[in-house]
C-alpha cells in the first residue's frame, strides 16, 4: 500500500482495504495503515467499513497483512502433508472435527490456485522459507487446473481427476491426527 501511495501529494490519506471472498458474504475487512496514514484517514476507513457492515481489524502494511500470514502457514502445512504423500482426502478432512466452515481445499477452490500461489510466493519472497511454495499448487497453476473439486453429473462434489493427477506423490504420509496437529501448530 505504501508503494502504491509513493509520489502522491497526500500519502497520509491512503489506506488499504483487504476484503475476503465472497465479499458480499464474508464480514472481515483488514484495513492496512502505512507508516504515513494519519488517524483521520483511519477513522474514515473504519466508518466506511461500518457502513459496509464489516468486522474490521487494523493491519500493518506488510506482505499478507494478518489473515494471509496465518492462513498461508496453516494451509501450507496441509499442502506440505499432501506433497509428502498424505492422500489429499486425509489432508483435506483432518480438521473437520474442530469447526471450520469448510475444508482447506474447499477454501482453496473459492480463492483459486492462482491467488493461492501468488500469496505463497509473495510471503516466501518477503518472509522466507517458513512460507513454502507447494510444488503441487505450482503445477496446478501451470497446467491451468482451477479447482481441487468438481461436480459430477448428479451435482455431488467429487475430486477433480486433473488435480489429483498433478498432486505430489511423496512417500512419507501422515495420519489425519498428525496433519491436524501440524496445521494447528503452524
Task: Name each model feature, range by range.
Residues 1-186:
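N-terminal glycine-rich phosphate-binding loop for ADP-containing cofactors
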Amino acid at each position: 500500500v505504501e508503494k502504491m501511495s509513493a509520489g502522491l501529494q497526500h500519502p497520509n490519506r491512503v489506506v488499504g482495504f483487504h476484503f475476503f471472498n465472497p465479499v458480499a458474504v464474508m464480514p472481515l475487512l483488514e484495513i492496512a495503515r502505512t507508516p504515513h496514514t494519519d488517524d483521520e484517514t483511519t477513522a474514515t476507513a473504519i466508518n466506511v467499513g461500518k457502513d459496509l457492515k464489516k468486522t474490521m481489524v487494523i493491519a500493518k502494511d506488510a506482505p499478507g497483512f494478518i489473515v494471509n500470514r496465518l492462513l498461508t502457514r496453516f494451509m501450507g502445512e496441509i499442502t506440505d502433508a499432501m506433497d509428502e504423500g498424505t492422500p489429499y482426502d486425509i489432508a483435506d478432512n483432518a480438521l473437520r472435527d474442530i469447526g471450520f466452515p469448510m475444508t482447506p481445499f474447499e477454501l482453496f477452490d473459492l480463492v483459486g490456485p492462482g491467488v493461492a500461489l501468488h500469496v505463497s510466493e509473495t510471503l516466501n519472497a518477503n518472509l522466507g522459507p517458513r512460507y513454502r511454495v507447494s510444488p503441487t499448487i505450482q503445477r496446478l497453476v501451470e497446467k491451468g487446473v482451477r479447482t481441487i473439486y468438481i461436480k459430477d453429473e448428479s451435482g455431488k462434489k467429487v475430486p477433480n481427476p486433473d488435480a489429483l493427477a498433478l498432486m505430489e506423490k511423496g512417500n512419507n504420509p501422515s495420519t489425519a491426527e498428525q496433519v491436524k496437529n501440524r496445521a494447528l501448530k503452524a
